[in-house]
From Swiss-Prot:
The keyword Cell cycle applies. This is Probable cell division protein WhiA. One of its GO terms (biological process) is regulation of sporulation. The keyword ATP-binding does not apply. Keywords: Cell cycle, Cell division, DNA-binding. One of its GO terms (molecular function) is DNA binding. Residues 277-310 bind DNA. Pfam families: HTH_WhiA, LAGLIDADG_WhiA, WhiA_N. InterPro entries: Homing_endonucl (IPR027434), Sporu_reg_WhiA_N_dom (IPR018478), Sporulation_regulator_WhiA (IPR003802), Sporulation_regulator_WhiA_C (IPR023054), WhiA_LAGLIDADG_dom (IPR039518). Belongs to the WhiA family. SUPFAM superfamilies: Homing endonucleases. Involved in cell division and chromosome segregation. Transmembrane segments: none annotated.
Amino acid sequence: MALLDDVKSELAAIDNELPIAKKAQATAMIRFGNGLHSVDHHILVQAQLDSQDAAIWLQDTIRNLYGHEATLTPVSRQTPTGVVQRFIVRVPKGSAALVLQTGLYSRYTKNMVLGLPGDIINGKIAQIKAAWRGAFLAGGHLSDPGKASYLEIVCPNHEAALALVSTARRLGITAKPRKLRSSERVTLRDPDAIERMLILMGAPHSAREWTGKRSDGEARGKANRLANFDDANMRRSAKAAAEACDKVRQAFEILGDDVPDNLKSAGQLRLDHADASLEQLGRLADPPITKDAIAGRIRRLLQLAEKTEKARRQAA
């Protein structure tokens, strides 16, 4: 646990990021810290973290960046392996405004975003790195030296896991989702990918310490070759995903509020899960639909926007 604590302390000490990156980190910490609750039909933001440094960072950011007061409460509980301490960051007033500010509540669908907001998933690389940093601060685990290598983040739901997988891909890293009992997790097992992710998140000192202590004996060059081999495919996939999201975003701008609910939901799913397949998008729909149905709805959304824009030009 000592090395994991060091990693989280190093990440929480970063203070030179742009506001968009700080917002992405705070949003991820709330989402992956199981921070969204419904109390008497009202939203309450209450995130649980295992790092005091991370909790202090989140409390300060909610106050200084979003303008809401947050409380920080340490709690302890006895387990078979000893006393476990957690830190609760709670927003007693202004939680509803905060989820709107973070993008965890969609203005388009009028529902909570189950993964990460599309503005982060499709955002700048600084936002992607910050989102992974926030997710790791909230739910991250790292293998101890001398044991099988892994970096893992416990996710609140499947959609959040998909968001991490797709954003890791934008960083050129392959992360795998898996289900352990009732828990959704995203895991990196390649030592070089773990070292690279630690550096990208902003923990170069911890990355060097972890790399120096690991004893798995795996050749580092193999991972580098695999990463280079995958780069071209990753770039092509990222370009196609970005183009698809741009078209949907443009359609929303053209149509404004005049969008049928089923088409709006399909478009928002594409924005929220840019790298998901049509089949995955269909499963994420509420209720679930086929990949052909989700593709048809997105196609009709784009056609409706094109028709509307054409009519406006003719009227002018």
